[in-house]
C-alpha cells in the first residue's frame, strides 16, 4: 500500500495527518510518499520530524495534479491511496477500503466518507448531474444518518481520500493533465475508471476528517487554485459529453434517491421484516438475509426496513457493507409514511415478510403508491396454530388459528403474488381460495457450497439439535425428544445429546443434569456451529407441529449432516428421502436414530448426497428461476 500525500506548505496540517495515520493504521502495511511541491516552510525539513517517509520534492512548483502524478511514480504498493494533507484519518479507515476493493473484482476505485472537523458531513460520495453541476451528497448533514452509511456506487469521490490499484492507475495514465493544476481531476478519474470497465464505490466505514480548502482556498472567483473549479467543470462536461447525457437530470430541486447511488437503471426493492435479520440466531432471519444477498447479487438496489427501526450490530453493518440501505432511527420511525410517499415513484417492489408485519404496511402502499406488493408468509401461521391445537387440545390455539387465517388471507388477496416455502402451503391455500396467486419458492438460498466435509462418521460423536427457542415448536421438539425418545436411545447406545439455539428457556436448561447425557449449549457462534455440525454423528429434528419448510433441516443438509426427523420436519422438502430419514412416534424415531448411529457407512452416503442436493434445490440459480418473473419491472428505466 502506497499512501501519496500531496503537500504545499501547511506543515502543521501535514504533521497532524501523519500522526493520525501512525495512530490509526495498525492493520495494513503501507509506505507514505510525501509529494512536496516546493514548500517554503518547515515541510522541506520534514524528514527531521518523521521517519521512514519517501519524500518526492519537485524542482519547480507543479500544481496539485502534476505533483500527484509525479509522486505516484514512486509508489511500490499494490494500491495507491491519495490522501490530502489537510486530513486526519480514523481507526479502520484504510483496511475498510482495502477489504472492499478486494471483495469484488468489479470495483476499480473506492473512497472515504469525508467529515468536517465540527462533525458535520462533507460528502458521502458525489453526484454529477447531466447539466454538469455537482453535489457533495449529504453536505452539512449528520454523517451517522442511515442514507450515508451503506456501500454504494457513486459518480465520483472527492480526491481527498481515494484508493485504486497501482495497475489501474498506470493503465489510465494518472490524472488527466487537461485539468491541471487542480479541480475535477477526481471526477474525471472516476469516469476513466468506469470507461476501463470498473465501478467507483463509496465506503462509509472509512471516515476521514477533512479541513476543506486549506490547500486551495474556497473562493471560486479569486486568484487561488479554487478558481479553476469553474473552468475545469466546463472541460469535464466537454470531455464526457456522451456520458453526461446518461446522468440524472437536475430539475432545480431533484430527488437524489437514484443519482446518489447510480441506480438509474436498477429496479429498487423495499424489503420489510420485523427487524434486521439476526442470521446466526434463527432460520427466519437467515432466509431474509439470504434473499437480501440474492437481490443485491442480481443487480437490484435494495432498501431494508425493520419494523422496530433499530440499528443492531453486527447485523446492520453486515447488510450495509453488502450495499443494502437500512432505514432506522427515530427520524425514519416517525416519518416512514412520508418517506414512502416521497419516493413512491422510485421504488418498484415492496417485499413484505410475515403476516404481523406485512399487515401494517400493505394498505398504505396499495392506497398511496403503484409499488408492486409481494408477500412472503414464511409459513402458514393459521396452519401451525391449528396443528398445535390438534396436538394439545388447547382451544386458545384454535382461536389464534382463526385470527391468523383472516390476516393471512387478507394479505394474499391484496398482494400481487404470495410466497410460501413449499407446495404444502400452496395446496392448503388453494383448497380454500383457488383464485389466489401463490408461489412455492426456495426457502433458503446458498451461494457457496461446502468442500472437504469430513465424511469419517465413525469418529463423530453425539446427537445434535439446532433451533431458536423463541419459536415454540422447537422447545416442544426438544422437550419431547428428551423425555420420551432419548431415554429409549440411551438404553441401547451410550450417546450425548447437544442442544444448540438462542433464547433457551428455563425448562430446556433444566434438562441438563449430571448423568443425563444432555448438554445444553445455548447460543453459539457460526464458527462454533459449523464445528458442531462437523463433529456430531446425527442431527435430530423431532418436530411435532409447525408449518412450512424448516430452516434447521435445510441448514443441516447444507452442512453435510446425517439427519433423522419427523414428517413435520421433512414437510415440503423435495425428495427428502435422499438426504434424511423420517420417523414418527417415540419408538420409531429412537429406532431410526440407533440404526443410523450404528451405521457410519449410511451416514457417509447421506452426507455425500447433500451438496449435489443443495445445488439442485437451494442455490441462487434455483431460487431466482422461481421468482424472476415476479421481480421484472413493468417499465424499463
Which positions does each model-derived feature cover?
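Acidic donor-binding segment of Leloir-type glycosyltransferases
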Residues: 22-60
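Glycine-rich, basic loop-to-helix element that forms the pyrophosphate-binding segment
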Residues: 58-75, 91
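Short aromatic/hydrophobic "clamp" motif used to bind/position activated sugar donors
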Residues: 80
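Conserved donor NDP-sugar-binding/catalytic core segment of glycosyltransferases
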Residues: 87-129
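A short, conserved alpha-helix in the catalytic core of glycosyltransferases
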Residues: 92-98, 149, 153-173, 178-209
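Short, flexible, basic/aromatic active-site loop/helix in glycosyltransferases
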Residues: 112, 117, 129-155, 170
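Conserved catalytic-core segment of nucleotide-activated headgroup transferases in glycan assembly
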Residues: 280, 284-289, 293, 304, ...
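Acidic donor-binding loop of glycosyltransferase active sites
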Residues: 346-348, 416, 534-548, 561
Amino acid at each position: 500500500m502506497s499512501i501519496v500525500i500531496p503537500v504545499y506548505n501547511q506543515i502543521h496540517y501535514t504533521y497532524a495527518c501523519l500522526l493520525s495515520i501512525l495512530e490509526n493504521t495498525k492493520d495494513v502495511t503501507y509506505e507514505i510518499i510525501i509529494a512536496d511541491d516546493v514548500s517554503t516552510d518547515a515541510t522541506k525539513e520534514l524528514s527531521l520530524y518523521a521517519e521512514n517517509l519517501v519524500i518526492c520534492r519537485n524542482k519547480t512548483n507543479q500544481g496539485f495534479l502534476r505533483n500527484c502524478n509525479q509522486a505516484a511514480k514512486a509508489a511500490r504498493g499494490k494500491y495507491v491511496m491519495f490522501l490530502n494533507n489537510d486530513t486526519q484519518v480514523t481507526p479502520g479507515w484504510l483496511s475498510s477500503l482495502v477489504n472492499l476493493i478486494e471483495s469484488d473484482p468489479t470495483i476499480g476505485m473506492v473512497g472515504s466518507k469525508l467529515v468536517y472537523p465540527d462533525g458535520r458531513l462533507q460528502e458521502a460520495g458525489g453526484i454529477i448531474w447531466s447539466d454538469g453541476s455537482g453535489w457533495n451528497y449529504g453536505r452539512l448533514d449528520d454523517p451517522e444518518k442511515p442514507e450515508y452509511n451503506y456501500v454504494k456506487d457513486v459518480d465520483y469521490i472527492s480526491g481527498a481520500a481515494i484508493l485504486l490499484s497501482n495497475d489501474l492507475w498506470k493503465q489510465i495514465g494518472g490524472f488527466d493533465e487537461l485539468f491541471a493544476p487542480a479541480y475535477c481531476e477526481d471526477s474525471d478519474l472516476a469516469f476513466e475508471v468506469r470507461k476501463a470497465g470498473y465501478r467507483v464505490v463509496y465506503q462509509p466505514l472509512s471516515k476521514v476528517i477533512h479541513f476543506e480548502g486549506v490547500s486551495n482556498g474556497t473562493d471560486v472567483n479569486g486568484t487561488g487554485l479554487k478558481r479553476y473549479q469553474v473552468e475545469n467543470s466546463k472541460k469535464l462536461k466537454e470531455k464526457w459529453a456522451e456520458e453526461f447525457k446518461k446522468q440524472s437530470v437536475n430539475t432545480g430541486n431533484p430527488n437524489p434517491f437514484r443519482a446518489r447511488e447510480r441506480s438509474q437503471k436498477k429496479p429498487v426493492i423495499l424489503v420489510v421484516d420485523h427487524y434486521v435479520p439476526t442470521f446466526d440466531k434463527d432460520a427466519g432471519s437467515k432466509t431474509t438475509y439470504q434473499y437480501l444477498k440474492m437481490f443485491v447479487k442480481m443487480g437490484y438496489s435494495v432498501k431494508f426496513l425493520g419494523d422496530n427501526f433499530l440499528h443492531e450490530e453486527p447485523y446492520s453493518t453486515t447488510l450495509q457493507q453488502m450495499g443494502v440501505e437500512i432505514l432506522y432511527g427515530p427520524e425514519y420511525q416517525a416519518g416512514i409514511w412520508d418517506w414512502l410517499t416521497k419516493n413512491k415513484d422510485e421504488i418498484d417492489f415492496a417485499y413484505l415478510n410475515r403476516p404481523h408485519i406485512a399487515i401494517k404496511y400493505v394498505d398504505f402502499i396499495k392506497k398511496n403508491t403503484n409499488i408492486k406488493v409481494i408477500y412472503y408468509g414464511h409459513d402458514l401461521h393459521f396452519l401451525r396454530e391449528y396443528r398445535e391445537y390438534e396436538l394439545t387440545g388447547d382451544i386458545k390455539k384454535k382461536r389464534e388459528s382463526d385470527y391468523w387465517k383472516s390476516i393471512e388471507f387478507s394479505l394474499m388477496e391484496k398482494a400481487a403474488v404470495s410466497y410460501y416455502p413449499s407446495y404444502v402451503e400452496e395446496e392448503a391455500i388453494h383448497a380454500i381460495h383457488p383464485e389466489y396467486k401463490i408461489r412455492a419458492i426456495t426457502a433458503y438460498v446458498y451461494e457457496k457450497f461446502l468442500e472437504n466435509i469430513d465424511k469419517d462418521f465413525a469418529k463423530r460423536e453425539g446427537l445434535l439439535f439446532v433451533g431458536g427457542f423463541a419459536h415454540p415448536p422447537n422447545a416442544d421438539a426438544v422437550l419431547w425428544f428428551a423425555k420420551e425418545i432419548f431415554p429409549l436411545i440411551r438404553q441401547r447406545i451410550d450417546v450425548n445429546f447437544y442442544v444448540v439455539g438462542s433464547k433457551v428457556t428455563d425448562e430446556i436448561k433444566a434438562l441438563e443434569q449430571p448423568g443425563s447425557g444432555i448438554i445444553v449449549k445455548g447460543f453459539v457462534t457460526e464458527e462454533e456451529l459449523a464445528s458442531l455440525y462437523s463433529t456430531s454423528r446425527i442431527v435430530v429434528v423431532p418436530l411435532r407441529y409447525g408449518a412450512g419448510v424448516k430452516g434447521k433441516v435445510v441448514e443441516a443438509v447444507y452442512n453435510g449432516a446425517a439427519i433423522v426427523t419427523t414428517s413435520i420436519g421433512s414437510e415440503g422438502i423435495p425428495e427428502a428421502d435422499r438426504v434424511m430419514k423420517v420417523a414418527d412416534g417415540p419408538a420409531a424415531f429412537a429406532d431410526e436414530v440407533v440404526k443410523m448411529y450404528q451405521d457410519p457407512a449410511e451416514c457417509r452416503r447421506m452426507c455425500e448426497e447433500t451438496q449435489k442436493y443443495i445445488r439442485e434445490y437451494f442455490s441462487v440459480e434455483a431460487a431466482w428461476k422461481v421468482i424472476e418473473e415476479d421481480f421484472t419491472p413493468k417499465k424499463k428505466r
